[in-house]
Amino acid sequence: MTKFFEKRLTDVIKRPLITEKATKALDLNQYTFEVDPRAAKPDIKAAVEKMFDVKVLGISTMNPPRKSRRVGRFSGKRPQVKKAVVRLAEGNSIQLFPESEEA
């Protein structure tokens, strides 16, 4: 674990990514999260294991390129994001969608 996130592991994971590809990966016990761009794989592993009380087997990270955006004559770039695909051990799961109670 890097010293940057040593005392604040909750800042590593920003939000889960819900896309068609990420939803299909749930069947393989893989969960996709948007994480802080400065986070390393040991930081992500420690954060997921602490926050969700699960065993992580592997992590794949991606730094997709930033996209350009224009508003009128002003151009800029979207913020940098980092994606992490976390593979959990058999029998572990993360509850991303709350159970709906029928009334």
From Swiss-Prot:
GO terms for cellular component: ribonucleoprotein complex; ribosome. It comes from Prochlorococcus marinus (strain NATL2A). NCBIfam families: PRK05738.1-3 (NF004359), PRK05738.2-4 (NF004363), PRK05738.3-1 (NF004365), PRK05738.3-2 (NF004366), PRK05738.3-4 (NF004368). SUPFAM superfamilies: Ribosomal proteins S24e, L23 and L15e. This is Large ribosomal subunit protein uL23. Belongs to the universal ribosomal protein uL23 family. Part of the 50S ribosomal subunit. Contacts protein L29, and trigger factor when it is bound to the ribosome. The keyword RNA-binding applies. GO terms for molecular function: rRNA binding; structural constituent of ribosome. One of its GO terms (biological process) is translation. InterPro entries: Nucleotide-bd_a/b_plait_sf, Ribosomal_uL23-like, Ribosomal_uL23/eL15/eS24_sf, Ribosomal_uL23_CS. The gene is rplW.
